[in-house]
């Protein structure tokens, strides 16, 4: 039985779920997304969110409030008489009156294995911490931050060199299918929600710019996890002399260097060890696989080396 759905989401991660719900035949009465943002060199252009663009393509009404705390916005939401609200990376706080408005409440697609990595940046934090698995969960929303009971989950292995971008793309596809299944089971009253475990709670705080500079004194595994957890955005970076000028280089992909003992003395941390962009860390080394110069496009390390004279003995700072 089709449900009357309010969809709430903003970034590209949310789009496959919106598309899948529409394809499954549910009635999407409105889409809530964050307002268009200033873009362009002078900030004079307003760019709609990826979800807004998709909703307009599907012919669905779009609403872009800056807050849902006002009585007028809450009344407008309630007037939709929705069966359920589906929330995927919306970005605004939902007051209790909003959570309680739909007949079946609000459910959320969250990209972690709760209660690990509640909060804003679960994909990045999982990789930065060296986790071996992640996943998508559908949970019933309540006032606490990602504290609600879980209805469905699907696990996903985190491969050794997988970046946050890779995991993002995998989980957004998994999440779309999982949400369609959740709605189908809710319509039949066959979906059971189970309280999260009290143990193992961690928080995925938003990534801060101060975290993005690489600390080469850390062990190679930690540096590798740091790089891939921040790739492609905002991107971990370090500086190196290119043509007599210190240049900031984004480090987008790496791998742990083979054949090196973590305890082996490789010299100064940040030092270039060979002609393949192998870099010494506090213990062990990593090999850079993909980098990006300021103002340039991402490039394979081999391509970058053809245009930049980086040789053994040079050093990242």
Swiss-Prot record:
Gene Ontology cellular-component terms listed: cytosol
SUPFAM superfamilies reported in the protein's UniProt record: FMT C-terminal domain-like, Formyltransferase
Signal peptide per UniProt: none
Swiss-Prot/TrEMBL catalytic activity: L-methionyl-tRNA(fMet) + (6R)-10-formyltetrahydrofolate = N-formyl-L-methionyl-tRNA(fMet) + (6S)-5,6,7,8-tetrahydrofolate + H(+)
Keyword list, A-Z: Protein biosynthesis, Transferase
Keyword Protein biosynthesis (UniProt): yes
A GO term for molecular function: methionyl-tRNA formyltransferase activity
Top EC group: transferase
HAMAP family listed in its UniProt record: Formyl_trans
UniProt family annotation: Belongs to the Fmt family.
Classification via NCBIfam families: fmt
Annotated protein name in UniProt: Methionyl-tRNA formyltransferase
Gene for this chain: fmt
């Amino acid at each position: 039985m089709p449900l009357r759905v309010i969809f709430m989401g903003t970034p590209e991660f949310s789009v496959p779920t919106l598309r899948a719900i529409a394809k499954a035949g549910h009635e999407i009465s409105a889409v809530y997304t964050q307002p268009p943002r200033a873009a362009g060199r002078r900030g004079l252009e307003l760019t709609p969110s990826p979800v807004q663009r998709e909703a307009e393509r599907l012919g669905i009404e779009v609403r872009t409030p800056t807050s849902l705390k006002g009585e007028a916005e809450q009344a407008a939401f309630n007037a939709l008489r929705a069966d359920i609200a589906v929330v995927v990376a919306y970005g605004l706080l939902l007051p209790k009156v909003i959570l309680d408005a739909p007949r079946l409440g609000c459910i959320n697609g969250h990209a972690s294995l709760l209660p690990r990595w509640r909060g804003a940046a679960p994909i990045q934090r999982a990789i930065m911490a060296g986790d071996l698995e992640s996943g998508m969960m559908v949970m019933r929303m309540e006032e606490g931050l990602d504290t609600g009971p879980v209805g469905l989950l699907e696990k996903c292995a985190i491969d050794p060199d997988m970046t946050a971008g890779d995991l993002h793309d995998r989980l957004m596809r998994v999440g779309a299918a999982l949400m369609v299944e959740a709605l189908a089971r809710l319509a039949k009253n066959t979906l059971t929600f189970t309280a999260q475990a009290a143990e193992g709670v961690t928080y995925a705080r938003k990534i801060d710019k101060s975290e993005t500079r690489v600390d080469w004194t850390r062990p190679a595994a930690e540096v590798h996890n740091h790089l891939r957890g921040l790739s492609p955005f905002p991107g971990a970076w370090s500086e190196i002399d290119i043509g007599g000028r210190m240049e900031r280089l984004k480090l987008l992909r790496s791998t742990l260097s083979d054949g090196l003992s973590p305890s082996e003395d490789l010299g100064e941390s940040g030092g270039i060890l060979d002609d393949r962009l192998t870099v010494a860390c506090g213990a062990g080394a990593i090999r850079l696989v993909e980098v990006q110069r300021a103002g340039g496009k991402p490039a394979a390390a081999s391509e970058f080396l053809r245009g930049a004279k980086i040789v053994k003995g040079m050093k990242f700072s």
